[in-house]
Structures are given as structure tokens and as C-alpha cells.
């Protein structure tokens, strides 16, 4: 899997969860203490989030890191 493919899957999972819980980019930015520009880049797939960003986003969205990154599915 390429980095680009990883980002695309990350975006898909984050945006689905955001819709499910009724969060927009601005709210996610505020709750994660990340700039709106950074969240926007993550959600456009133009920037790969750091591990700490993935952890932070997973906590805010109440998702496990495995659920958010699908690594759990890869090792089943």
C-alpha cells in the first residue's frame, strides 16, 4: 500500500465518522487543537498526519487507532 492509498483510506474513515457524529472540520480542529488548515490538508489527502495527530483525532472521534487506520484488518 502506498502512502497516497493510506491517506485516501484515512480520509474516508475520518470523514465517515465525522458525518456519523455530526462534526465539521472547524469543530474537529477546535477539539483536536489543530489548525483548520492542517485538518483541511488531512481531509483533502494532501498531507499525511503524524502519529500524534492520528492518536489525537482517534480520541476525539472515539475510535481506536486500529479502527481509524485499519491496521487491525490487515493483521486478521
Give the label of every model feature segment.
Residues 16, 41, 70:
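DNA-binding alpha-helical recognition surfaces that contact promoter or target DNA
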Residues 23, 49-52:
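Residue-level signal for the short linker/turn that defines the boundary of a DNA-recognition helix
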Residues 22-41:
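Short alpha-helical DNA-recognition segment
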Residues 52-67:
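DNA major-groove recognition helix of helix-turn-helix/homeodomain DNA-binding modules
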Amino acid at each position: 500500500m502506498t502512502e497516497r492509498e493510506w491517506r485516501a483510506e484515512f480520509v474516508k474513515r475520518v470523514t465517515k465518522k465525522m458525518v456519523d457524529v455530526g462534526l465539521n472540520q472547524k469543530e474537529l480542529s477546535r477539539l483536536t487543537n489543530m489548525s483548520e488548515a492542517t485538518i483541511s490538508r488531512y481531509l483533502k489527502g494532501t498531507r499525511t498526519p503524524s502519529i500524534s495527530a492520528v492518536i489525537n483525532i482517534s480520541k476525539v472521534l472515539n475510535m481506536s487507532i486500529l479502527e481509524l487506520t485499519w491496521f487491525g484488518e490487515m493483521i486478521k
